[in-house]
Amino acid sequence: MSSEHIQNKLALLPDQPGCYLMKDRQGTIIYVGKAKVLKNRVRSYFSGTHDSKTQRLVQEIVDFEYIVTSSNVEALLLEINLIKKHDPRFNIRLKDDKTYPFIKITNERHPRLIITRQVKKDKGKYFGPYPNVYAANEVKRILDRLYPLRKCSTLPNKVCLYYHLGQCLAPCVFDVEASKYKEMQDEIVAFLNGGYKTVKNDLMKKMQVAAENMEFEKAGEFRDQINAIETTMEKQKMTMNDFVDRDVFGYAIDKGWMCVQVFFIRQGKLIERDVSQFPFYNDADEDFLTFIGQFYQKANHIPPKEIYLPDDVDSEAVQAVVPDTKIIVPQRGNKKELVKLAYKNAKIALNEKFMLLERNEERTVGAVERLGEAMGIPTPSRVEAFDNSNIHGTDPVSAMVTFLDGKPSKNDYRKYKIKTVEGPDDYATMREVIRRRYWRVLKERLPMPDLILIDGGKGQIDSAKDVLINELGLDIPVAGLAKDDKHRTSQLLFGDPLEIVPLERNSQEFYLLQRMQDEVHRFAITFHRQLRSKTGFQSILDGIPGVGPGRKKKLLKHFGSMKKLKEASVEEIKEAGVPMNVAEEVHKHITTFNEKAKNTEQK
């Protein structure tokens, strides 16, 4: 659609609440929003300046629709449903549910007490969430001892162990009145809603009576139940003392991002929290409302008895989303402090996010920029690094890794089997791989690097530059990475003539070069080992006097693997059925081969 088309539609927007749907060139809905005044909100996207994320959204908008509603509350409810239906990519996307465990009383003729992570609309009674399965199991264990509900998923034809333990009424054999189940369910509900203190007091009275009647075994059982209640139900620090289930919301905003923290308070205890961070495009309080609406659409987020909100939120709109929950905007006291605590945690989480982003920027993009400055070249956003690997001239390979803005781009990694070089000639190997790589770059019009890094010194650098300039006509900066006697990145060589680029050893740009050199070395060695594992046995035994195809097969059959042959003594090799002089030659050859391999891998 043309900008004229959008301007014409903007002129027709009403001064009423409603929802708007932004569309891209394919007609896909990419963003859904709500507004108290549609005209003001939608026009704001196409006028004035915006931050980068909002600008990205606006750049993709080629058309929009709107739906007028009778109130802001109705707009919120409609927005939630539209987001659920269309899943626009620029809207808040709540992370996948963290499925908390719940205790459930099943809706069956003979109900069971189970632990589940799935909350369904099946008329069962759900209690929770609990912070983990262990906590839920602890509570269920107490309930199983106190209330003998059915344990088996299907009724057997005879009583089981639970009946003999007093933890099941055995409905498989005996008739159990529905009123008995209702009584137990009511007591379980009361227990989980803070009434366990009443249960504990009743048990203490029963324990005293049993002790007075000399029924010490029964008194001991009551004592164990009391101890279980004390250790399980009373070990957490109380947040509130009225045992009401609550969700406490707080949010913070910074640099176009919002963090929402939700504290789950169950039975007076703060048991868990949910943290969500996302960019927002609307007014902060409006997007926060949308978040709450989406939050309680998740199956495992059961609205509690009460919800605490910050004082800048439209509580009437939230009430429409969760009509059976009491919405409270605390003004003072402990309740207000809980909301402040949720806000404080949200602010800390956002600060940490941006600090981590800054640190990551410092060690990647920032390091690349400073590396370019130190070398006197434009910022090398794309760096391609090369390393060769061979052992005694066998299976020579080369590898290339690519870093984009200081980060590995593994889709752009390449590995090469060397085709034209005989023996361990590092310079010729470098010439071949540079020729193959950049001939293809030219042919297929692939992205050119801003810098080529060679794992080596003057000889390797000159070989690479000669191919680039004199054969391919390319002028790409080439630098070399030298190592010290401990095989660690030591110097960056660059220029004509070559000079050491002065870099602080503890600088991020030096660390970046280390990561590049280590990564290309790892990639080359891994590729070389893969080839050696396929051809190693054959190639190591090639050229040994007295070892032809028949004896190679005999050695392989006897030892089973190259690893075992490498570890074998002369006598053990002789036991494979070869003469002593041949066994000595094989052992000598393998020992020499292993020493050279070790030295090459340390390169």
Curated annotation (Swiss-Prot):
SMART domains: GIYc. Pfam families: GIY-YIG, HHH_2, UVR, UvrC_RNaseH, UvrC_RNaseH_dom. GO terms for cellular component: cytoplasm; excinuclease repair complex. Coiled coil: none annotated. GO terms for biological process: nucleotide-excision repair; SOS response. Residues 197-232 form the UVR domain. This is UvrABC system protein C. It comes from Listeria welshimeri serovar 6b (strain ATCC 35897 / DSM 20650 / CCUG 15529 / CIP 8149 / NCTC 11857 / SLCC 5334 / V8). The lineage of its organism: Bacteria, Bacillati, Bacillota, Bacilli, Bacillales. The gene is uvrC.
